[in-house]
Amino acid sequence: AGALASAAALAAALPAHAAPEVIRIGVATAGGGDPVTWGGSPGGVARNQQWLEEAFKGSGTRVEWLFFKGAGPAVNEALSNRQIDFAYQGDLPSLVGRANGLETKLLLASGTRNNLYVVVPAASDIRAIQDLKGRKVSIFRGTNGHLAAVNVLAANGLTERDLKGINLDTGSAQAALVSNGVDAAFGGYEWFKLRDQGLVRVIYSTQGQDPAFTRQAGLLVRSEFEQAHPGEVQRVVDVFVRAAQWSSDEKNRAALFESWARSGTPVKSWEAEFENQGLAERNSPLLDGFVVARYKAVVADALQLKLIRRSVTVDDWIEPRYLQASLRKLGLEGHWRAHDSRGKPVPGTDSVATNAR
């Protein structure tokens, strides 16, 4: 009752607006499948199960999902043009948008510690990161993978200038690599499908490395929409938290990968991406010390690399009240283990979601 009362008080504290006719959610990937969906985030589960549509059934508000081949930068353009209300987006593009004046709020994490890989054609002589010097390498610039790639290069004594970098989206990079149009590519789980077909080799993986090399993603809302429709924002967050709970349960591991496979990325690829990693650690919605520290590090790195022209703050960009209300309402306070800025578990935050496999 207390949680419901606080949610009601939250809604009452802001000016009343008519319910929106539509809630538009932009997803920073082209996705795949029919209907189009995506994987690697609890949001994909909510999409596949139609939990958001269910939450707004009978309210007069419909839900629209929009997928962007141009990933994070294209989502920023849609936010700027008020074509979407919520965005599932990676850390770098969301902060580039903020630095460029987009008024958004970060509501929750939704797919963290996403791995980065370097792949080469199966017959390539490239064996290590250092071998990329002077080679044609695909990097999807402006995405969260871009900054992670720069950090991996730096850890191996290279800069982006040491490569013949080519800016290609995910699909174009795959076509270029298998036709030897590029010598190597940075990317994510989408490469496992080609690896399993014997077309490419993985020469580097962030798995088991410093989690600072991984990529984070979250759910944002346009500030204007959040201020006008706090009740609807709460409903959306409730659904994403419900999806995070389901996606964090090890009993659902096989079903989760089957759900994500609807996007066209096979189950085997998800098994490889999540190998030796707990679901709860990857699918927690918490904006904990680790997630906040990574977003702050992204600001510093992006500024140094001149990917943004001015620094931006992170602490006041986060709007935690909806997540906190959801955790109370759904009885999930203490469900996920929090991690510190280095990605280590915070003592005393053992949780039911961290059960070992």
Q: Where are the regions a protein language model picked out?
A:
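Conserved C-terminal helix/tail region of periplasmic/extracytoplasmic solute-binding proteins
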Residues: 300-357
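Extracytoplasmic "Venus flytrap"
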Residues: 22-48, 142
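Beta->alpha turn/N-cap motifs
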Residues: 27-29, 69-72, 82-95, 143-144, ...
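Pocket-lining segment of extracytoplasmic ligand-binding domains
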Residues: 166, 172-264
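Short helix-initiation/N-cap motifs at beta->coil->alpha
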Residues: 65-77, 90, 158-178
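Flexible hinge/capping segments at coil-to-helix
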Residues: 121-136, 227-231
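Secondary-structure end/capping motifs
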Residues: 33, 228-312
